[in-house]
Regions:
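Active-site anion-handling motifs in enzyme catalytic cores
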Residues: 1-228
Length: 228
């Protein structure tokens, strides 16, 4: 909205509508929730991140700090008998998955590699079943978080942009938003434990907010197509 105002558009009477992902056809939404050997599955979303978009020279140190925090969190998950399913949002994130696994091995020495699931996702159609197979999602990419919510998954968002914080707030999950620029493994673990503990209470809230967003988009489509 601020950008539109800046280039001369009048936006005072314009309504802001939810992301179009909320209107995904029901046929695309899988309803699968499998546990690996009875263990709970955590969808862990990774992304290439080297600092705020406004920073002219991205920092490798910033990226490594982000990655090392994820590795420490993953080490805690493995120590507490969780299965980790890596999630990506762009093709370029596959290199992050590889580096993550390398750092995890360096950190832990040996671990049960069957408890780290890393499958390619080259499309939304491939990504959706991967998210559906998780019990809880901890993710960085906006659309990993958004798709998890559409699938009614309790989420911790590692927020790299104000749009992530806004989404979590709109979904009633503001307390489960973790600022990527101030990552703290201990606090991330606490947020994860809280979201897991409250998962059954959160799911109806998420479902209701998603349905509200879907109805808002229906309204938007009606307004658009009536004017054509």
């Amino acid at each position: 909205m601020n950008y539109l105002k800046g280039i001369g558009f009048l936006t005072n009477s314009d309504r802001v509508y939810p992301d179009l992902v909320f209107s995904l056809p029901e046929i695309m939404i899988p309803h699968v929730n499998k546990k690996q050997g009875g263990r709970p599955v955590v969808g862990l979303g990774v992304m290439t991140y080297a600092g705020r978009y406004s920073v002219e020279k991205p920092s490798n140190a910033t990226y490594l700090e982000y990655l090392n925090n994820l590795v420490a969190f993953a080490g805690w998950l493995l120590a507490h008998d969780y299965v980790i399913r890596l999630l990506t949002g762009e093709v370029s994130d596959s290199s992050v998955s590889d580096e993550f696994k390398s750092l995890l091995k360096e950190s832990l020495g040996q671990y049960d590699e069957e408890r780290i699931i890393d499958e390619p996702a080259l499309s939304v159609e491939q990504l959706l079943p991967q998210i559906a197979a998780a019990d809880i999602v901890v993710a960085t990419r906006f659309h990993n978080v958004l798709l998890a919510l559409v699938l009614n998954k309790p989420v911790v968002s590692i927020s790299f942009h104000h749009k992530c914080a806004s989404l979590m707030s709109e979904m009633g999950l503001a307390e489960y938003c973790h600022d990527i620029n101030h990552m703290n493994t201990g606090r991330l673990i606490q947020q994860f434990q809280d979201v897991e503990k409250n998962a059954e209470k959160l799911k109806p809230v998420i479902r209701q907010r998603v349905e509200q967003s879907r109805k808002a988009l229906d309204e938007q489509y009606n307004l658009i197509f009536k004017s054509i």
